[in-house]
């Protein structure tokens, strides 16, 4: 179904509630907002299959805007609200967006990138005035709530890493199905996690991430209520569970860690008995952390392994995990294969590249080389991880290819920081990679070879950190920099980053489980 169908039977039922203010939007209001939004897109000249982009913090309008694009049969790209203006402009241009929507929260960046997105003909601001942008609220008031045609499903097109370190859009074919038809994610929400029209789904993560956005969309299709937190805070999370009697929630392991660091008296002060299903993914979860969470909340914790690409899906419940500690689950969509560097399949227990054999079809937008590199000749595709499968068919992730960093559930691609730091006048060579962090799982570390090694000092470290932060979102930048007289490079120019990385991991090992 879709919000309009739900509204026919329960028009006043809350579809969205902001956890901090209690502000709510009913299913009828959500449907009418989406219809007006779809009409606005169509009136501007956008047609099914075209692209729109949005960069918003977690706020009431986020999901209704996405639903408007969905109603209009458009691709919609949600951009991280942490990005700088140049990073935002790159994604807006790369996805080919004809419309861009942002809020006063990103007003400075919106103004900075105005001249850098020449193909965007519809520029809209939410929550106030931004120079060069039309106010969305005023334009929506002029739009009808009549359906636009043709009535087909839109789709998100979210961004992953590219071969150069730049993000790349993960594009799947438009569904070509009637608006409201059940999709794979919505079906899984009901099948695996028991989601239904009575579900109260608490969403503490940024909505621009694939899983939160798709889970919220699926809950709306089922007819459940979505509670949106502006940001994650452990106490506020527990307060929201108690206040709204949340039944379902998706988190990342860092949130588990922050919750467990609360005093026991603080944890026990809140009633979380309404929870029926808690799902985690997106980052490594230390075995002791997961054990403690199961002890606290019970066997309601689920885990999955999948990607924005939608090429496969592994899953385990608490019982499965307790009998196979460290697993990320069994494949329930697609068939798992572990292969060596030549593409030959490996036996049980052997470590190699993790591939899915499935009907899932995706491409990296404007990057055929990356698309090809993610697939074998037989059609199997990978998310770039390596791991092993046990005799029961459970998957264990062992390491990450290309040393992608996962810090607090956020994927960070070190090539971006390397490209920036390399351009600094004092830098001769640089390597960026993840090092252990008890709270975040990993943090970003840089090792730099200076043009003049004698300049190595805390002052130069601060200079380089600030230089990076001026050009990239802070989350992508190193937290610290070490200096070396020379970095380990092969005569061909290949950097042996593993040699550097392993020094910092020590007994922790470069392992995900």
Residue ranges and their predicted role:
Residues 2-26, 128:
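AMP-dependent adenylate-forming
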Residues 3, 43-44, 67, 71-142, ...:
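Structural core segment of the AMP-binding/adenylate-forming
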Residues 15-59, 63-66, 84-89:
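Conserved AMP-binding/adenylate-forming core of the ANL superfamily
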Residues 51, 57-85, 93-99, 199-200, ...:
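A short helix-loop-beta submotif of the ANL/AMP-binding
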Residues 156-158, 162, 221, 246-251, ...:
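Gly/Ser/Thr-rich phosphate-binding loop
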């Amino acid at each position: 179904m879709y919000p309009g169908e739900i509204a026919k039977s329960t028009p006043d039922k809350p579809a969205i509630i902001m956890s901090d203010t209690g502000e709510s939007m009913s299913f009828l209001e959500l449907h009418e907002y989406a219809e007006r939004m779809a009409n606005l897109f169509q009136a501007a000249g956008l047609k099914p299959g075209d692209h729109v982009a949005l960069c918003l913090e977690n706020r009431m309008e986020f999901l209704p805007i996405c639903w408007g694009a969905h109603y209009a049969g458009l691709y919609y790209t949600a951009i991280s609200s942490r990005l700088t203006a140049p990073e935002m402009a790159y994604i807006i241009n790369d996805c080919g967006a004809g419309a861009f929507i942002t809020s006063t929260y990103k007003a400075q960046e919106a103004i900075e990138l105005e001249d850098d997105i020449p193909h965007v003909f519809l520029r809209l601001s939410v929550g106030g005035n931004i120079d060069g942008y039309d106010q969305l609220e005023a334009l929506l008031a002029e739009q009808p709530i009549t359906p636009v045609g043709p009535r087909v499903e839109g789709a998100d097109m979210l961004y992953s890493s590219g071969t150069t370190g730049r993000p790349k859009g993960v594009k799947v074919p438009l569904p070509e199905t009637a608006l409201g038809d059940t999709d794979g994610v919505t079906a899984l929400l009901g099948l695996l996690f028991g989601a239904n029209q009575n579900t109260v789904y608490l969403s503490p993560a940024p909505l621009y991430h694939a899983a939160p956005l798709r889970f919220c969309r699926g809950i709306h299709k089922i007819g459940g209520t979505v509670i949106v937190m502006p940001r994650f805070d452990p106490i506020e999370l527990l307060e929201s569970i108690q206040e709204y009697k949340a039944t379902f929630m998706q988190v990342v392991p860092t949130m588990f860690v922050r919750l467990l660091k609360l005093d026991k008296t603080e944890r026990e002060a809140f009633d979380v008995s309404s929870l029926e299903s808690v799902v985690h993914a997106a980052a490594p979860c230390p075995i002791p952390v997961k054990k403690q969470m199961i002890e606290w909340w019970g066997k309601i914790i689920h885990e999955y392994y999948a990607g924005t690409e939608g090429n496969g899906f592994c899953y385990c419940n608490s019982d499965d995990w307790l009998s196979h500690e460290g697993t990320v689950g069994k494949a329930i969509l697609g068939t798992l294969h572990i292969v060596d560097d030549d593409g030959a399949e490996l036996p049980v227990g052997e470590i190699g590249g993790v591939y899915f054999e499935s009907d899932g079809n995706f491409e990296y937008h404007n990057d055929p080389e990356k698309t090809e590199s993610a697939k074998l000749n037989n059609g199997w595709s990978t998310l770039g991880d390596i791991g092993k499968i046990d005799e029961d068919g459970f998957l264990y992730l062992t390491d990450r290819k290309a040393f992608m960093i996962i810090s607090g559930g956020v994927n960070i691609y070190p090539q971006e920081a390397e490209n920036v730091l390399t351009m600094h006048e004092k830098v001769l060579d640089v390597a960026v990679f993840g090092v252990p962090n008890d709270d975040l799982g990993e943090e970003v570390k840089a090792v730099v070879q200076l043009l003049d090694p004698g300049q190595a000092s805390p002052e130069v470290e601060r200079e380089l950190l600030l230089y990076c932060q001026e050009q990239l979102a802070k989350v992508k930048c190193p937290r610290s920099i070490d200096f070396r007289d020379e970095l380990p490079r092969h005569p061909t120019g290949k950097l042996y980053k593993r040699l550097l990385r392993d020094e910092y991991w020590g007994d922790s090992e470069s392992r995900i489980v």
